[in-house]
Amino acid sequence: MRAFTSLAGHILGSHAAINGYFEMHINYDDASALDKQLAVFHENEALKQNSHYLFDKLLHNDYQLKLERPGFENIKILLALREPEQTINSIVDLFAQKETEELYASPEEATKYYIERLEVLADFCRTLAQDYYYFDAELLQSAPEILLPAMSGWLELDPPLSERYTIFSQTGKARKGDSSNLIHSGTIDKTRIDYSHIRIPKDELRRALSVYRDCRQQMIDHATDSVTL
């Protein structure tokens, strides 16, 4: 969450071989979830002719991917982390804008959420029998010329992924991903958002950074391949 996942989804979903670009909020606990994924996609979009992939992103611990169950043998798994300070700031900023009082508008609660997510992802990687690929999420914005060719190779895409992407029917809509104006640009925006109004307690940030470094290293160590800062 808040790790350029909407940007990643749009870049991937703009390729002729890939369908999907938004978060579908599905638990993949058995192969029947793949039918649900296709049904959710068809609510707003149509499959591209001669395409190979159907994309989804799992951003929260509420949604699981049970790869030990039959039916998931042919999926491709990409995993990414974003460093804690900007991620936590982005979470707080997002929830502070909501009209109702939100738990994650608190830097302390957002930090707790972030740490719990990292720990679940690291555990997932330690126990995963299938191949997966890791990248530092910041590379989508800071060095797409390095990251996108690697992603194209992992997914066996020809032509390779482009820095330009399509604006789709669900782009910017609530519960579909990033709802800011940035996602409507159609290309990678390298503007760094100012979060100077948010204060994360130093002890909390220090703890998040320690967990991030540990979990990130574990995810890199177990990956089939990785691209890092």
Please give the residue ranges for each predicted region.
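Soluble or luminal CAZymes and related metallo-dependent hydrolases
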Residues: 36-37, 59-60, 109-117, 200, ...
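PAPS-dependent sulfotransferase catalytic domain
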Residues: 60-162, 181-186
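Short catalytic/ligand-binding loop motif for oxyanion handling, primarily in non-cytosolic enzymes
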Residues: 3-9, 28-30, 63-65, 86-90, ...
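Glycine-rich phosphate-binding loop used to anchor ATP phosphates in small-molecule kinases
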Residues: 47-67
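C-terminal non-catalytic accessory extensions
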Residues: 225-229
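Short beta-strand segments
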Residues: 22, 54-57, 134-136
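PAPS-dependent sulfotransferase catalytic core
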Residues: 1-52, 164-222
